[in-house]
Amino acid sequence: MAVQACALSLRLGLWMSLLLPVLPGAGARAAGARWSGEGTTPHLQSIFLGRCAEYTTLLSLEPGNKNCTAIWEAFKVVLDKDPCSVLPSDYDLFINLSRHAIPRDKSLFWENNHLLVMSYAENTRRLMPLCDVLYGKVGDFLSWCRQENASGLDYQSCPTAEDCENNAVDAYWKSASMQYSRDSSGVINVMLNGSEPKGAYPTKGFFADFEIPYLQKDKITRIEIWVMHEVGGPHVESCGEGSVKILEDRLEALGFQHSCINDYPPVKFLMCVDHSTHPDCAMNSASASMWRESPALHAIGDISLIISLLVALASSSQA
């Protein structure tokens, strides 16, 4: 996955606007800011605890087994550390307290398509990407760090990988990514962006460096790669090309059974809901061929999605 992240829709934009009030100077790098990243998210503790409470009450697979206050206390230890001296291991207790089982066949890894992943996963109803497990949910889209030479939080800016390797947010996602990989099992889904100019599979990215190495081969049936191309966007890479071929070769060398499909239809249909008249969204023989070649497409959950999306597309075209 990329650093922060699980590009939802209008609902996400509304949710974020309600959840992340903008303070003067927040959201853009202020003049004279020490670091290149956004500063600590206003009301960090309240947002963290609110997300935790919502998850454990409404979504958790293990209701009643998580203490959100204890999880916050374990997390906030890093807020007392130098902003460039935070290690993944500093989140160990936080991960241990917030960790829970990931349903078999429900893991979804990704690069460069955070919001599409969130939209398709549908709040754990369809799949469960890292940003939909508890230890990923509480920090998603947030930023945090201590001031460089003081004890308070830095609301002006926080370091990113451009500033220093051991920054608080990257360390968090490294730790979460490693645990997510260890806990994933069955069929592993990977969504890549085939329209990304730098390539669909970053060979130096979170998926490459902190997720693939921690997959437990004895727990995994196969890995399915979905290379999605943006509606109206370029086809920079597809299955068997460029960095995708590098990924396929790596999985082969590691002994994983794997397959790759371009523009996995259920996800493509979702992308086309807002672009129903675009040529990229026309149902054609190529789409039908991809459908026939992928047995997984006949799962009940995907069929229900496709039916609902086809209805939406038909309604849009008649409007």
From Swiss-Prot:
Residues 295-319 form a propeptide. It holds the Pfam family Rib_hydrolayse. One of its GO terms (biological process) is regulation of calcium-mediated signaling. Gene3D superfamilies: ADP Ribosyl Cyclase, Chain A, domain 1, NAD(P)-binding Rossmann-like Domain. NAD(+) binds at residues 110, 173, 211. A lipid is attached at residue 294 (GPI-anchor amidated serine). Keywords: Cell membrane, Disulfide bond, Glycoprotein, GPI-anchor, Hydrolase, Lipoprotein, Membrane, NAD, Signal, Transferase. Disulfide bonds join 52-68, 84-164, 145-158, 239-260, 272-281. Glycans are attached at residues 67, 96, 149, 193. InterPro entries: ADP-ribosyl_cyclase. Its EC number is 3.2.2.6. Residues 1-33 form the signal peptide. It is a lipid-anchor; GPI-anchor. One of its GO terms (cellular component) is uropod. Pancreatic islets, kidney, spleen, heart, thymus, intestine and salivary gland. It is found in: Cell membrane. Catalyzes both the synthesis of cyclic ADP-beta-D-ribose (cADPR) from NAD(+), and its hydrolysis to ADP-D-ribose (ADPR). Cyclic ADPR is known to serve as an endogenous second messenger that elicits calcium release from intracellular stores, and thus regulates the mobilization of intracellular calcium. May be involved in pre-B-cell growth. Belongs to the ADP-ribosyl cyclase family. This is ADP-ribosyl cyclase/cyclic ADP-ribose hydrolase 2. It comes from Rattus norvegicus (Rat). The gene is Bst1.
